[in-house]
Amino acid sequence: MVEETTLDLVKQLIEGSPERKFSESLDIAINLKNLDMSQPKNRVDEEIILPNGLGKTMKIAVFAKGEVGLNAKDAGCDYILTEEDIKELGEDKSKARSLANECDFFIAEVQYMAQIGKALGAILGPRGKMPVPLTPDKNVADLINSTKNSVRIRSKDKLTFHVSVGRRDMDVEKLAENIETVLGRLEHSLEKGKHNLKSVYVTTTMGNSVRLV
């Protein structure tokens, strides 16, 4: 059950924003306080599974081979990348950047992580897209399905950052639930919890914004 305040504010935002010819993204803008962001321990870097997804198709690439690669393909991932592909992408930075921009998430069998870090870390790292490790105890299909409903919140060294929580045309209660999930996880990751939150705004891509915190 979502908070009435969150639900009311999302309704207010959507009703007060003009209709667009495309499906707008609904984002939250987060402003932190009383944190020294030059200290890595204070930076936010969390991957969060949204209970209601983002309302759009996520592109996922998987570094795998053999049966794992086949299972990933059956699960609907967009690209299966091999050891040879890692080497090729490492040598062709333009192609690597294009793939990094196209895909929302990457998954990799653990034996490829070191090679990926060396060949592609400089491209994937700053984008917050280093692969999610696929350990032997995990099922690749389950990981793909959960990743499709995930967002990553990253502050880097800034006190202000944004994260998408869905699309404007989603059910209002589902959007509110997504927002509360992100904020709950964010507060848990901060040293002083909600006391490190200066403000939180909910906004559409081209519309108005409303203050939640």
Swiss-Prot record:
The keyword Secreted does not apply. Keywords: Repressor, Ribonucleoprotein, Ribosomal protein, RNA-binding, rRNA-binding, Translation regulation, tRNA-binding. InterPro entries: Ribosomal_uL1, Ribosomal_uL1-like, Ribosomal_uL1/biogenesis, Ribosomal_uL1_3-a/b-sand, Ribosomal_uL1_arc, Ribosomal_uL1_CS. PROSITE patterns: RIBOSOMAL_L1. It comes from the Archaea. GO terms for molecular function: rRNA binding; structural constituent of ribosome; tRNA binding. GO terms for biological process: regulation of translation; translation. GO terms for cellular component: large ribosomal subunit. It holds the Pfam family Ribosomal_L1. Part of the 50S ribosomal subunit. Binds directly to 23S rRNA. Probably involved in E site tRNA release. Belongs to the universal ribosomal protein uL1 family. This is Large ribosomal subunit protein uL1. It comes from Methanococcoides burtonii (strain DSM 6242 / NBRC 107633 / OCM 468 / ACE-M). The lineage of its organism: Archaea, Methanobacteriati, Methanobacteriota, Stenosarchaea group, Methanomicrobia.
